[in-house]
């Protein structure tokens, strides 16, 4: 427990996604808890919607004195100390959770981005605006995504209750309960008004007491899902002063340390005729950060930034999203064709849930990878999918299947990888020698 607390002081240990229909308050709820706005890009600010995956860390504290539940729970930024003074009663606030929030876009054309975010989630907040009928289209699709990724812990946040009467809020609460019964998802419904901070302590209470800390394996081989990548150098920086590329994501298993030799798969993908050549990026970790906190080692859970010696041009503008990072020579295989056991959603609010056909083009989400695919041999329960872009993945991994309907990719089903055809990665001679020594 002491070790877990020491880790929690420095980095988040739990990933919670915010999902739901567009403009239902996902980014606002994250800001109410963390104090950080996840809307940062120019296009997002202009339109006041999330376009890329947003992220923010927050520490949740519990007052050990006179404050009673749920008001004994308070949240602050991730750089806050592990003990604070309670301004309500003068008691001591003790750290009980350190959470990374993954803020997903709600617009229908950004469904693939939302699905990428589910790859690293341990639990979700499903936002439903109280001033609109339930369900809205993306509420339904996002709930499908929760089922696909087998996320068991769901908190339904009935937001914007300040915009409706008590009777309207209760009526919509009944709509939400009926909606949840149409799926395999269940969870408590928490009314909030995030814009003015109403009932945020109750939400924190549920995060602490309803969502358990996931069991992590820090002794396994490290595997990090990449959801962001950056070039942090300002224009005009001299070559001798440039920093290497920065990779953002979440460690699923294992540990990473400053100085580790790392590999990123599938890396640089080149098409030669009818075959792919994959050259993984090989680099070294020069820094680890959890927001503004410097780390010497990173544990599974939470979002971290990894500074590398890579050419930053390969990392800029999220070029590495969908790749997988780990220690050199110890990552899953790279597949260009997969056999999937799948099922389509029997109930859907959109058209086009007909059977998949040989030769049809579909979109697959594998981990944080989004890739087009052409269907090969297929029957009602399994099929072969030729990937437009190779993916680093594992047998048994869950995938999401989307079909283009009215010029938009819409989620229609899910599956599990049962087999596949691999690509042998190509390395420079000196890297091959290093791998043999590591083996």
Curated annotation (Swiss-Prot):
Domain (tr-type G): residue spans on this chain: 11-215
Region (G3): 103-106
Annotated keywords: Cytoplasm, GTP-binding, Hydrolase, Initiation factor, Nucleotide-binding, Protein biosynthesis
Enzymatic reactions: GTP + H2O = GDP + phosphate + H(+)
One Gene Ontology term, aspect cellular component: eukaryotic translation initiation factor 2 complex
Entry binding sites for GTP: 23-28, 159-162, 193-195
InterPro entries, per the entry: eIF2G, eIF2g_C, eIF2g_dom_2, eIF2g_GTP-bd, P-loop_NTPase, T_Tr_GTP-bd_dom, Transl_B-barrel_sf, Transl_elong_EF1A/Init_IF2_C
EC number: 3.6.5.3
Chain positions covered by the region annotation G4: 159-162
G1 as annotated region, ranges: 20-27
Subunit and partners: Eukaryotic translation initiation factor 2 eIF2 is a heterotrimeric complex composed of an alpha, a beta and a gamma subunit. The factors eIF-1, eIF-2, eIF-3, TIF5/eIF-5 and methionyl-tRNAi form a multifactor complex (MFC) that may bind to the 40S ribosome.
Protein name per UniProt: Eukaryotic translation initiation factor 2 subunit gamma
Species name: Encephalitozoon cuniculi (strain GB-M1) (Microsporidian parasite)
């Amino acid at each position: 427990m002491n070790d877990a607390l020491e880790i929690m002081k420095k980095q988040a240990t739990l990933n919670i996604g915010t999902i739901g229909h567009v403009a239902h308050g996902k980014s606002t709820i994250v800001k109410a808890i963390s104090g950080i706005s996840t809307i940062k890009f120019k296009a997002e600010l202009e339109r006041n919607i999330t376009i890329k995956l947003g992220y923010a860390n927050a520490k949740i504290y519990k007052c050990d004195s006179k404050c009673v539940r749920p008001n004994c729970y308070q949240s602050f930024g991730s750089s806050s100390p592990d003990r604070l003074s309670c301004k309500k009663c003068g008691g001591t606030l003790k750290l009980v959770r350190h959470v990374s929030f993954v803020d997903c876009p709600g617009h229908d054309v950004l469904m693939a981005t939302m699905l990428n975010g589910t790859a690293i989630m341990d639990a979700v907040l499903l936002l439903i605006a109280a001033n609109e009928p339930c369900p809205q289209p993306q509420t339904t699709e996002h709930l499908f995504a929760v089922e696909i990724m087998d996320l068991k812990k769901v908190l339904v946040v009935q937001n914007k209750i300040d915009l409706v009467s008590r009777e309207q809020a209760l009526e919509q609460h009944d709509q939400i309960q009926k909606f949840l019964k149409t799926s395999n998802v269940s969870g408590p419904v928490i009314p909030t008004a995030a814009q003015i901070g109403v009932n945020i302590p109750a939400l924190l209470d549920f995060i602490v007491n309803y969502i358990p800390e996931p069991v992590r394996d820090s002794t396994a081989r490290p595997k990090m899902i990449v959801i962001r990548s950056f070039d942090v150098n300002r224009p005009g920086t001299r070559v001798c002063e440039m920093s290497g590329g920065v990779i953002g994501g979440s460690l699923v298993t294992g540990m990473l340390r400053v100085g580790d030799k790392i590999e990123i798969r599938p890396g640089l993908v080149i098409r030669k005729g009818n075959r792919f050549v994959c050259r993984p990026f090989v680099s070294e970790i020069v820094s680890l950060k959890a927001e503004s906190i410097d780390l010497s080692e990173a544990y599974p859970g939470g979002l971290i930034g990894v500074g590398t010696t890579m050419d930053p041009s390969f990392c800029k503008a999220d070029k590495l999203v969908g790749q997988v990072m780990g220690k050199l020579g110890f990552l899953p295989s790279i597949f260009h064709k997969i056999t999937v056991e799948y099922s389509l959603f029997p109930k859907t609010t959109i058209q086009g849930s007909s059977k998949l056909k040989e030769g049809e083009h579909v979109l697959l989400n594998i981990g944080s990878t989004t890739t087009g695919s052409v269907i090969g041999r297929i029957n009602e329960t399994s099929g072969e999918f030729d990937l437009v872009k190779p993916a680093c993945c594992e047998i048994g991994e869950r995938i999401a299947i989307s079909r283009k309907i009215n010029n938009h990719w819409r989620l229609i089903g899910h599956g599990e990888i049962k087999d596949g055809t691999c690509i042998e990665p190509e390395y420079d001679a000196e890297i091959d020698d290093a791998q043999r020594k590591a083996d």
